[in-house]
């Protein structure tokens, strides 16, 4: 049994390294192509950041049912997003990392087909949630140059693709650590104070909605992917460490003035296309080991946050289950209008992610709205829309009570 486990782990690790090598190679080709294009153009003062997408209906012949409508907002003056690629609206565009999505076909369903750094074909949960609760149609990345006062006052995303609760996770891929995201948040608060004064700034921070999504990269990449922590911890100990780190982050948000804080758990990561490919065998089944780890972490995260919430005054701190909704979509795809749930729309859909999903080497599926996954790791805009609707309809109640 131990020999089989080690053999399987080494095999998965080799595949992961192969994917990383291909990503580096494709990134090099994309960089060379972009450099060649720049040499052929008239010089300009410097690249301008891509404009934020304008609000528009979700594309495709089979849009998700619009059961959730944007309402006039009298409760949340702003939204703040922290964590990984699920909520990253473009921060990775402005740091030195390979984990980027600022090129087509990412963003292909935004107006003018502008890729903004979101790891999706369109909007992501931070955008949908902000829109549904009446804050604004899209959430800009904090590191994006040229943010207006209005952009900042209504909230931004500090999230970074590839980050996690384990400090080692962002180091491996050069993402923004959770600790640095918190530093940016505190820096942001000072900017807001400069705009509207201390009292108004404290109101915005305390009444704004803070959403945190992380943990998937810790489990899928740091622990099981590269086995960087597997030799030091068993999965029970590691998930306890993750939950403790998450609770510490929650406390620091609270101490910074946030009073409405939601932590979204980890989805069934064993069922995402790349894990089916690398760990699911010839039949590409879900990787039960990863799904078990996700559920174990979610249980500990929920318990940790519930205990911590008892110590916080006038604060709503809640755990939000995403595993059940995500799993229901996988188990009952027709219920949600999906035809494909085990591969992504980009390329073969088996391994493509980041630089491997590009307009030069990757063909796209004919009907993206029928796919649950955009690349081998991230859901499509339509899948995100459905999940965000469920969140707003089922989990927002406690935030309105405070």
From Swiss-Prot:
The name this protein goes by in its record: GDSL esterase/lipase At1g20120
Residues that carry a glycan: 73, 314, 367
Entry keyword set: Glycoprotein, Hydrolase, Lipid degradation, Lipid metabolism, Secreted, Signal
Keyword match Glycoprotein: yes
Enzyme class: hydrolase
GO MF term list: lipase activity
Its EC number(s): 3.1.1.-
Catalytic residue list: 85 (nucleophile), 375, 378
Gene3D superfamilies: SGNH hydrolase
Gene Ontology CC terms, in alphabetical order: extracellular region
Top-level taxon in the UniProt lineage: Eukaryota
